[in-house]
Amino acid sequence: MLKKLTLLIAGFFVVLQVSAQSQTPNIIFILADDLGYGDLGSYGQKLILTPNIDQLSKEGMTFTDFYAGAPVCSPSRSVLMTGLNSGHTTIRGNMTKKGGNPGKKGVQTIYRANLSEKDFTIGNLLQQSGYTTAMAGKWHLDGYDTLATPIHRGFDQFSGWLVSYPETYSNGYWPAQRYINGKTKIIQKNTDSKKGYYADQITTDEAIDFLSGQQNTKKPFLLMVNYNNPHSPLDAPDESVYANKDWPKDMKTYASMIYNLDQSVGKLKQYLIDNGLSKNTIVFFCSDNGARSEGTKQLTAVAEFFNSNGDLKGYKRDMYDGGIRVPMIVWAPGIIEPGKVNSTPGYFADIMPTFADIAKSKVKYTSDGTSIYSLLNGKQNAVKPRFLYWEFFENGFEQAVRYGDWKAVKKAGKIELYDLKKDIGETKDVSIQNPDIIKKIETYLLTSRVESPFWPVD
């Protein structure tokens, strides 16, 4: 009798475990801000410590040829949210060229665009697919419109900062207020310019608070965790880990910001493991664009000191790979074999179809991307060569295309062509030697985009 009871109990737990594994996976997408391709140990960094993110890489899949949506924040995140490339998505720059919503950046009046009610987001997609959706941290797609927050664009919960609520970011990394589900909340530790509660620590705590409410629910969830680090200004809560380094102060601060980011990721991962969520959760880690070097000599010196973009050419705001190629690591114990490296080109527009596949969604949507979910399951060549597209307006109208190993950058009407397999640093223009490839790219560019009222082509 005792033996039968033992077998029955064992069988019950096996059924329970199989049932849990058969549920649609949860999704967590962690986004760093201005983290360079070469800023992580798993991508070649020698000076900055990133043990937790490196461990994600060892235990998951590391993408070598993954790209953000644009070389700056807002359009890149717009591509991520809508699944449309920067020639189709609503927001194509941090500030508009024409029209938009007025607001203040310091004493200057600037104009921004926002995601509209017509924009179908990954939040909308997963909401309609039965997921609970949440976001913590940076949004940057409201464009001074208080009715264009994440909770108006497909997210059940949002806590973070918004450009339409200046009080939530006016004190940089030490915000005195936080926007939480339609209301602002005072952060007492940061009032009167105090520095008691670091922004990314707040974001991590908010993410864990959300996760704590998901353990006893049958609904799967999407959680977007959008950190500020290591975006300027240089400001870290603790620099003790590099105290003994013979480095200039700015270098210690930047390295400490990335170390803080790494510790935040480690804290989230450990929470998933400790609370039984890791077995059915897929975690993505990425950056919104390349490392920043422009703006001040201070930022240039930091980027060069750490070689933040590795062997890539350019930085944030460049259409060369240093501006748009980013780290991408996916961690999912039991789904992804550890230590895998994938060189298939992909970009932010792929995230929406990938999430749709993970969710087994039947919801209709439009995307310029292709699901990379099959790559996570070990099918190395499952995604066929296709065109990846970017456009940018801050330096005049520029376009970029990736097709297989070919990378094209079009400036002032002239196309430069690089063979990334032989020339990852985009140092040798081989357009003259490859007229057939140029013709193919020119043909693609004829239909790669639609006009935008906010970013007209002069």
Residue ranges and their predicted role:
Residues L2-K3, A20-K411, I415, I424-D458:
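Formylglycine-dependent sulfatase
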Residues T6-Q17:
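Bacterial N-terminal signal peptides
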